[in-house]
């Protein structure tokens, strides 16, 4: 799961790998975990073993060979479980970029379903961690290790359940396909290749992404909500550069490059892009309103009914950064450089502007608006990262009802909320290629446990096993 963005798909070419999986058995599993530290039932022990093995691989951008080995290890487990060699394939769309695709063959009466995860992680500095980041720890009811949350638990949800269902002899009414990428945190080359050049390996009615959505606890441990990601904002980055002749600092000029750039930054900081809602964000506002105080809930419902309600939009935007990011496109300065000596006038100054653009909004319109804001200043605008447009995925009633039923069966009266994420995942490549994607990680966590990319990344032991069991049920439910 990228918190800070993705890179281009310009180099999406090369060889591929495919793994295909089939599932079966009508019985519904129990979510019971006797104790986070007791001996586990066989299927839960399998999940823990896979997670431990995965965390042991330092599958970072600096260690692509470790990413390859992690994918090979999962391929070996699947083949040992009975998947034919031709249905478990490793791919390398470009040098240092690896993936795995698995096909679980079914009766093939319906279009296949696709399940997504990524095996790569961001770098971790061992000295800063309380536990070795690349060795699975288990303490105080948590699994600790780099990638436990993002996204090796997701890989485990898929691989362990494919193995379990294969051994149980269950055959679905359609093929089930797993596509596991090894570069989601950096370039997204593998997912882009799967969605385009390798489309025949992953073509499906829709995809379920383990790297988005999930359950949310309150600070006191009550289950608050279950999120389904249906869309993502477009990630786009610009550089604004002011230049002039420079000179000696004892002879100031009115066209100082840093001063010009500061004016541009100030104008952009004072600008709000318009509120634009889509079906996902309208439903998100309506369904999540009950989780907020009455005044906020009223504003949420009012805005869902009328996106031109500027008063409601302003109250929500100023009270919560998450609301502001959900309602509108945002463009903010993230990096700054300029000048070459303390006693010299700067010849140039540059600011990096990172934009998160609402689905359905054209990136060129945002660039034109930035140009309008700084039009009278001598500043160049350059795109340094060209994002990939990814529209919202329509959410069929039957799919939503299936997820709601599973959530209620296992966790009771928990509101299910379709949502738009402000970050980026592999899902954007599939949406862009025409495959609907729904983020359903099913992992519950407290705000204090959101440590992806950070120190002492962790997930609850019970929450992990419950999410794997939920996926077991979901695979069987959706494949019929």
Question: Model-flagged regions — what are they?
Answer:
Residues 2-17:
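Bacterial N-terminal signal peptides that target proteins for export
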Residues 14-27:
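Bacterial N-terminal signal peptides
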Residues 28-32:
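Sec/Tat signal peptide C-region and signal peptidase I cleavage site
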Residues 33-126, 348, 363-364:
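N-terminal helical capping/dimerization or prosegment-like subdomains
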Residues 110-180:
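Active-site metal-coordination/substrate-binding segment of hydrolases
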Residues 173-256:
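Histidine/acidic-residue-rich, glycine-tolerant segments that coordinate divalent metal ions
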Residues 193-194, 250-274:
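A short core secondary-structure module
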């Amino acid at each position: 799961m990228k918190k800070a963005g993705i890179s281009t798909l310009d180099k999406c070419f090369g060889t591929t790998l495919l793994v295909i999986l089939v599932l079966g058995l009508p019985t519904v599993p129990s979510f019971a975990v006797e104790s986070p530290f007791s001996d586990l039932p066989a299927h839960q022990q399998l999940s823990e073993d896979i997670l431990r093995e995965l965390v042991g691989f330092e599958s970072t951008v600096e260690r692509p060979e470790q990413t390859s080995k992690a994918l090979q290890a999962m391929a070996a487990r699947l083949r040992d479980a009975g998947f034919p060699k031709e249905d478990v394939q490793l791919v390398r769309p470009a040098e240092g970029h690896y993936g795995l695709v698995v096909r679980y063959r079914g009766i093939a009466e319906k279009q296949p379903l696709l399940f997504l995860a990524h095996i790569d992680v961001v770098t971790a500095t061992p000295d800063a961690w309380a536990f070795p980041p690349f060795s699975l720890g288990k303490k105080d009811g948590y699994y600790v290790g780099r990638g436990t949350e993002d996204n090796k638990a997701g890989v485990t949800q898929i691989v362990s359940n494919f193995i379990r269902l294969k051994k149980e002899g269950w055959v679905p009414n359609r093929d089930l396909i797993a596509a596991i990428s090894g570069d989601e945190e950096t370039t997204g080359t593998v997912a882009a290749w799967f969605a385009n050049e390798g489309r025949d390996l992953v073509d499906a009615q829709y995809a379920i992404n383990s790297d988005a959505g999930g359950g949310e606890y309150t600070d006191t441990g009550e289950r608050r909500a279950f999120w389904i990601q249906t869309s993502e904002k477009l990630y786009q980055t610009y550089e604004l550069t002011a230049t002039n002749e420079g000179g000696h600092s004892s002879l100031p000029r009115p066209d100082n490059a840093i001063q010009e750039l500061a004016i541009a930054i100030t104008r952009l900081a004072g600008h709000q892009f318009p509120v634009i809602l889509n079906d996902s964000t309208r439903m998100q506002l309506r369904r999540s309103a009950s989780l907020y105080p009455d005044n906020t809930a009223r504003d949420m419902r009012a805005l869902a009914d009328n996106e031109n309600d500027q008063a409601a939009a302003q109250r929500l935007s100023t009270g919560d950064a998450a609301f502001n990011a959900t309602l509108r496109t945002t463009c903010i300065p993230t990096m700054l450089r300029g000048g070459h000596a303390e006693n010299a006038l700067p010849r140039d100054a540059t600011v990096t502007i990172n934009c998160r653009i609402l689905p359905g909004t054209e990136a060129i319109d945002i660039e034109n608006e930035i140009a309008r804001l700084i039009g009278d200043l001598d500043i160049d605008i350059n795109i340094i990262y060209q994002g990939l447009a990814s529209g919202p995925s329509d959410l069929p009633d039957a799919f939503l009802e299936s997820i709601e039923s599973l959530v209620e069966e296992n966790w009771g009266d928990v509101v299910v909320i379709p949502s738009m994420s402000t970050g980026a995942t592999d899902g954007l490549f599939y949406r862009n290629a025409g495959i609907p994607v729904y983020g359903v990680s099913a992992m519950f966590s407290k705000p204090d446990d959101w440590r992806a990319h950070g120190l002492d990344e962790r997930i609850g032991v019970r929450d992990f096993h419950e999410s794997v069991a939920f996926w077991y049920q979901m695979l069987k439910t959706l494949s019929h």
